[in-house]
Amino acid sequence: MNADIDLFSYLNPEKQDLSALAPKDLSREQAVIELERLAKLISHYDHLYHDKDNPAVPDSEYDALVLRNRRIEQFFPDLIRPDSPSKKVGSRPNSRLPKIAHRAAMLSLDNGFLDQDVEDFLGRVRRFFNLKENQAVICTVEPKIDGLSCSLRYEKGILTQAVTRGDGVIGEDVTPNVRVIDDIPKTLKGDNWPEIIEIRGEVYMAKSDFAALNARQTEENKKLFANPRNAAAGSLRQLDPNITARRSLRFLAHGWGEATSLPADTQYGMMKVIESYGLSVSNLLARADDIGQMLDFYQKIEAERADLDFDIDGVVYKLDQLDWQQRFGFSARAPRFALAHKFPAEKAQTTLLDIEIQVGRTGVLTPVAKLEPVTVGGVVVSSATLHNSDEIERLGVRPGDRVLVQRAGDVIPQIVENLTPDVDRPIWRFPHRCPVCDSVARREEGEVAWRCTGGLICPAQRVERLCHFVSRTAFEIEGLGKSHIESFFADKLIETPADIFRLFQKRQLLIEREGWGELSVDNLISAIDKRRKVPFDRFLFALGIRHVGAVTARDLAKSYQTWDNFKAAIDEAAHLRTILQPSSEESEEKYQKRVDKELISFFHIPNMGGKIIRSLLDFFAETHNSDVVSDLLQEVQIEPLYFELASSPLSGKIIVFTGSLQKITRDEAKRQAENLGAKVASSVSKKTNLVVAGEAAGSKLSKAKELDISIIDEDRWHRIVENDGQDSIKI
């Protein structure tokens, strides 16, 4: 059973919410139901933790469940179950797999679901490299195996470390477990391997091995695994390598990370080299030089999917030439030179029980379909996204309808069809008032979302902002989950982010709360204290500013490096916006475009447009927000974010490219400059530090000479790039 399952609905079909009742207030019948729920829920969490090393809840929440079970048993000793958690020997250990930072980011892949997505991918390649329509674009094609991504580090041919993908930046150290996987060599074959190479691929479990494992689980009266992927993930992340060794895991290589050298100049060639080292590579790996061959491969693999002895969820295309890969580069989350062409999602029929409205941290009202539980692609689904009011109207769904549910991309459940549109039922109306604070909900022009206008008077928004603040990609405070924040907020223990860091002052009050004790409270306070120092990008993301996601926050942190620099820029931009007054002949739209253009030029951060900048300035212009941030800064210390590129002499410098570049495109040159920490401007000004002049450079070159700005040609620029920004030129 999946961690996302609504276990309460299964164990308590009448949906009596007994969790809020104190043990002494339960009737005998209620105690029976509650003890069954707790026994199965705790067993479920034990399974995720011990068998999969994948804890679904913080320690404090787990401890609260165990304590509640024990207290109910004290009031009803004759109802103690044979499978009671109180009968289990030992307690939940605190150990965790060590965390390791990837030396080269372990990124995801961009997904495509339609043939058109593949055409668009090839179109982007052709435009970037100025290729003709009929010019071949050679790609490798291979099945996308559904396993757990892992990076194997070999130094002088010897396996020294194995790390899971994690969040792409930091993964889990699973070296002891990987050493017991039979088809992962401890020493590479041959002698032509690089001094250091990280070989990346998927740890997986074959379908036949999965069936055998579940057969053993049945014989031993143990819980069955839901699917091979979950079994592989749990087996690899065991704390005891002996358990991993019994699980018949396999490894299939599909790429590499850090490498001191590459013995081939194509993706296909590199995979054959990796295969010669003794690692498994897909025997279906092939090359294709046009979209017809790529789609033929996709259709062939999809047709054979059921007969393969391992799960796959699509096909991966990669540019074959490694120099093309390097030039095409990476986005913040994925390589641009690759595309995962996913198979159609699996579908199932069920009944729509209700439509609930959730209020997000920015006030967006999101409809969520509550479903009669149904298995889709090996996972039990009881909720699905309905996106927005337009989607509900398009589908015409109402509570009681039979609907078709799919896991889009095999991940997010969504309703794709109403199977009973002609049945006479009342139309479901989207609410125009917030279901939490009753404020008016409005839909802004050009947007599909309805938003609560209550702002920070809306408890739901305040709670969601606090949840966002402590989330994994923000402050990442372990043990402070949504249920705790909701409870603490309701009792006015926390109302702002700074209050979280003052919870130690309320230690005794916390200890006296039901489900808490000295150990749980002290663990929480310790976890909070560990986050009093936070990287600049995480701090900025944690503020929950609309349109400022993790990538934008990181771009801002990379550009300004310190909070003081950033805040000074915000203040200066706010002043600039104030003095940019509209002219009498200027429409509101033209005025806004002019302001946006000035502000975009002022910040000069790639991919940061007027919408993001306006949101930033509006946030800090709000007195309440500034007060919340100032209060928070009394409790935490923001660590400057100095990227590895910050050591480049070009870091923070403003560069202008002019004229026609012969060896690379303008976009490539811009990306090279940004990778060295520089900013690229479109016009020459006193702030410009360097001008790179190609052939037929015109007025920009003349202006650079007038302002006595350093000027170099394209060849000199390439030498600078090759030397990571090092050059004798005065900038």
UniProtKB/Swiss-Prot annotation:
NAD(+) binds at D59, S60, E61, Y62, D63, S108, L109, E142, R165, E202, K318, K342. GO terms for molecular function: DNA ligase (NAD+) activity; metal ion binding. Its EC number is 6.5.1.2. GO terms for biological process: DNA repair; DNA replication. Transmembrane segments: none annotated. It catalyses: NAD(+) + (deoxyribonucleotide)n-3'-hydroxyl + 5'-phospho-(deoxyribonucleotide)m = (deoxyribonucleotide)n+m + AMP + beta-nicotinamide D-nucleotide. The active site is at K144. It is an enzyme of class 6 (ligase). CDD domains: BRCT_DNA_ligase_like (cd17748), LIGANc (cd00114). Keywords: DNA damage, DNA repair, DNA replication, Ligase, Magnesium, Manganese, Metal-binding, NAD, Zinc. Its cofactor is Mg(2+); Mn(2+). DNA ligase that catalyzes the formation of phosphodiester linkages between 5'-phosphoryl and 3'-hydroxyl groups in double-stranded DNA using NAD as a coenzyme and as the energy source for the reaction. It is essential for DNA replication and repair of damaged DNA. HAMAP family: DNA_ligase_A. Belongs to the NAD-dependent DNA ligase family. LigA subfamily. This is DNA ligase. The lineage of its organism: Bacteria, Pseudomonadati, Pseudomonadota, Alphaproteobacteria, Sphingomonadales. The gene is ligA.
